[in-house]
């Protein structure tokens, strides 16, 4: 590790007078990833969060000092304090840092500092950025380029969401939720798509969100590269406003890198990509869905345009095991009513839920799709209510859990009971509302049939509930 740190230090100067870096909200995947990279660079890392989780456990095992709970004393020796977007200005540690004149910065500002002396590749978009970031990271690793990467979710092939490489490459997921991706200064930027989400950040104005994405792309140097999805109407509307080289990809006939002949069998997808030079490249993926073909093609475009050969690209994509909680198969289980498959998925926006359902239908045509859905945030449920009603009506059986608030206060009419009523009124599926999470295993056991594909869907604690199901079924 010492030799690696010395090599990196020759390339990336250390931050002047920074010794101890404290993270408030260190248990988040994005925060923990940056903390892990800095820890491996040799900085003294401390952090706090309200509860232990896999991220805090990993950081502790690597030498980080983790506090459970927030206290002013946690920042006493900090040179700088890094805060996640979930941390409020009145947090006791933030207040204490200001009183001690310790710099307080956003997560993306620290990520930007990591990127400043490296060749940065930033992946943004409403959907698909975590998987695309993981795919690019694995291609560069396969090519022997030893990149640093910081992702918002687990890169299964690497067993972590962050890694400190010894090369000049840094591949990072860019966060639009608080517009903090504007701090980044990459050499290559990918935008997968743009849809209304996190609209409080953009004052409820979708045009403001679109302008912010254009500004993000203008953070590229004049010789930089913007990679944009040709299937996304909003992105294609913005292309004329982007004063940088733009290369597009997608199923659209107008795409520079065009996808053809997509087919899916179970978890496996395969298709062709036609390059601008007319080369036909056959891609094999072991993650399902057309949305993953788009993610993989974005990764291919970046790699091809940066001079990586086809062999490394194809091998990395064929070996790609997925990102954490992205159509994550937890297993097949024998129940009294028959054999079922359980899949855990992070998607929490109507579009994400829709492509997950589509992937399930395409790969397992003869199975019922049973969804356990936990809405995430009252504001998102309110803003996208009709879209949720439409997409959730596409499953065969729907179990609805209460909204996961993520720190928000309830909003009238944006709760799961209201959602259930509207879905029921549409007449396609009769939702089952489960208020008591402890009853979920019993409810699921009552409704499942032989061959069912069960999707545990959402960004809250539904993942823990799905693992409770596994434990229940394994013991039973």
Curated annotation (Swiss-Prot):
UniProt binding sites for ATP: 125-131
Catalytic activity: UDP-N-acetyl-alpha-D-muramate + L-alanine + ATP = UDP-N-acetyl-alpha-D-muramoyl-L-alanine + ADP + phosphate + H(+)
Listed GO MF terms: ATP binding; UDP-N-acetylmuramate-L-alanine ligase activity
Pfam families reported in the protein's UniProt record: Mur_ligase, Mur_ligase_C, Mur_ligase_M
Pathway: Cell wall biogenesis; peptidoglycan biosynthesis
Alphabetic keyword roster: ATP-binding, Cell cycle, Cell division, Cell shape, Cell wall biogenesis/degradation, Cytoplasm, Ligase, Nucleotide-binding, Peptidoglycan synthesis
Localization of this protein: Cytoplasm
Signal peptide residues on this chain, from the entry's feature table: none
Domain of life of the native organism: Bacteria
Gene Ontology cellular component list: cytoplasm
Enzyme class: ligase
UniProt-listed GO biological process terms: cell division; cell wall organization; peptidoglycan biosynthetic process; regulation of cell shape
Principal subcellular localisation of the protein: cytoplasm
Protein task: Cell wall formation.
Name under which the protein is recorded: UDP-N-acetylmuramate--L-alanine ligase
Taxon lineage: Bacteria, Pseudomonadati, Pseudomonadota, Gammaproteobacteria, Pasteurellales
């Amino acid at each position: 590790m010492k030799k690696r740190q010395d090599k990196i230090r020759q390339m990336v100067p250390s931050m002047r007078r920074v010794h101890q870096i404290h993270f408030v909200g260190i248990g988040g995947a994005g925060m923990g990833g940056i903390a892990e990279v800095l820890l491996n660079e040799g900085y003294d890392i401390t952090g706090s969060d309200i509860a232990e989780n896999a991220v805090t456990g990993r950081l502790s095992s690597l030498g980080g000092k983790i506090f459970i709970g927030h206290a002013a004393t946690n920042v006493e020796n900090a040179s700088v304090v890094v805060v996640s977007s979930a941390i409020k200005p009145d947090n006791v540690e933030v207040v204490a840092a200001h009183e001690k004149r310790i710099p307080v910065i956003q997560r993306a500002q620290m990520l930007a500092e990591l990127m400043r002396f490296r060749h940065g590749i930033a992946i943004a978009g409403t959907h698909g950025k975590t998987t695309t970031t993981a795919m690019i990271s694995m291609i560069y690793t396969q090519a022997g380029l030893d990149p640093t990467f910081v992702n918002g979710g687990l890169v299964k092939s690497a067993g972590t969401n962050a890694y400190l490489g010894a090369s000049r490459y840094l591949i990072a997921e860019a966060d639009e939720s608080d517009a903090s991706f504007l701090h980044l200064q990459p050499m290559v930027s990918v935008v997968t798509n743009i849809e209304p989400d996190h609209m409080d950040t953009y004052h409820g104005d979708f045009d403001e969100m679109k302008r912010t994405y254009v500004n993000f792309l203008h953070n590229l140097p004049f010789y930089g590269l913007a990679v944009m999805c040709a299937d996304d109407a909003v992105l294609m509307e913005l292309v004329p406003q982007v004063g940088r080289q733009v290369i597009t990809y997608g199923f659209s006939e107008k795409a520079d890198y065009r996808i053809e002949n997509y087919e899916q069998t179970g978890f496996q997808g395969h298709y062709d990509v036609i390059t601008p030079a007319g080369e036909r490249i056959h891609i094999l993926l072991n993650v399902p869905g057309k949305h993953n073909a788009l993610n993989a093609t974005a990764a291919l475009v970046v790699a091809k345009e940066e001079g990586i050969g086809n062999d490394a690209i194809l091998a990395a994509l064929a070996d790609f095991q997925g990102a954490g909680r992205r159509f994550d198969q937890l297993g097949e289980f024998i129940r009294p009513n028959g054999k079922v498959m359980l899949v855990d998925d992070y998607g929490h926006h109507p579009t994400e839920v829709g492509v997950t359902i589509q992937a399930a239908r395409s790969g397992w045509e003869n199975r019922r799709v049973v969804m356990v859905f936990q809405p995430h945030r009252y504001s998102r449920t309110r803003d996208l209510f009709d879209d949720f009603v439409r997409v959730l009506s596409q499953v065969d059986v729907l179990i609805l859990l209460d909204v996961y608030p993520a720190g928000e206060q309830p909003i009238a009419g944006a709760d799961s009971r209201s959602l259930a009523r509207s879905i029921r009124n549409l007449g396609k599926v009769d939702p089952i509302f489960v208020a008591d999470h402890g009853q979920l295993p019993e409810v699921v056991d009552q409704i499942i049939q032989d061959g069912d594909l069960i999707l545990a869907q959402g960004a809250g604690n539904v993942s823990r509930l799905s693992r409770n199901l596994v434990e229940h079924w394994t013991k039973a």
